[in-house]
Amino acid sequence: MNDIFGNNNGYRVPKLPFFYYIRNIMDIQLKQGCKYALLVPTSMGLRVTPESGQPIHSSDILHLQATSAETNVASISSYLGLPVKVLTTFVEGSPFAAFIKSNLRARGMDFEGADVPQGGPWGYRHQINVADSGYGSRGPRVWNDRAGEVGRTLNAKDFDLDRIFGKEGVQIVHLSGLIGALSPDTTKFCLDIARAAKKYGTRISFDLNYRASFWKGREQELHDAFSEICSIADILIGNEEDFQLCLGIEGPEAGGKDIASKINGFKDMIGRVKAQYPNAQVYATTLRQVNNTNSHNWGAIMLEGENWHVVELREIHVLDRIGGGDGFVGGLLYAILKGWEPEKWIQFGWASGALATTFLTDYAQPADEEQVWSIWAGNARVKR
């Protein structure tokens, strides 16, 4: 296994040993004596994709995957050997719950969560994400089917947060705005986790991940909750739409062309975020300009302390774009956990995001660090 210091002992899937160390990374001091490098709360679901990039309505062969944005992020660390834990909930006795648990084990992740009784055929279930990856001039389409989603019941009372953060220990907890906005219960769940993390010295990463349908009718409530999390977060991530619609912070027009010419506008936006939420040590956003479904220009901006780091937009070839942003966050967090210099945080994040778009799953499955760095270097030569 790869231990926390990156030594390879012949196995990919970690057995989650305790490790004892402390690192000062610029202003980010990671907690010592922790069992887990990374913790992610999430609502696990199913991703259904047609074969060969075909549209749903014309397909009769569908592939089933286990999915969530938060485990997409955590997969970079787990595949590269760091100990990861997932907090979630399952439908009791469901074959899909068994499928999800098997997938998390295969990714090298510990998981913990209640098995909730289904309550009959019209009761709880795991959410379904139907994804048409698109091709060429035909753009991707995603259909979310979340009726009866068991993850909406996530509640801090189902977990011993004092044990998880105090006795076991966690270096970084990654929170997503998807879970934060999923239901009133999950909003409180994320707040409780953030407060417990702060109490025990765990660093907090927060990706705003705005979804209009989740926010409808709850705008003020969610703005207040997200603002509290942002006020104690150590790492803040979001795109121009996230910062504007979640926090009311002005930024560049969402989407559009010629993103490269707007980099100063993105920097100004991040500066306003920092002024409003000065506790964080790292602020990051990705840049994406879509040429066609299979060709994107991909970049990133990061502010750590007073230092700007910019990855200028570069063309990447895309098999499936879903999960690229999660891959960026996962690579960024992995680089921070490894104690690398800040310049490498954004580089590894950019390359991990690019790697994720080459997989049919919506999460990257890096073979090793070298594979990720080869993407950064633009080297796609055969490795023998």
Annotate each PLM feature.
Residues 65, 73-85, 106, 335-338:
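Alpha-helix C-terminal capping segments
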Residues 69-79, 190-196:
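Histidine-anchored nucleotide/phosphate-binding helix
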Residues 84, 111, 204-206, 237:
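Hydrophobic beta-strand scaffold residues
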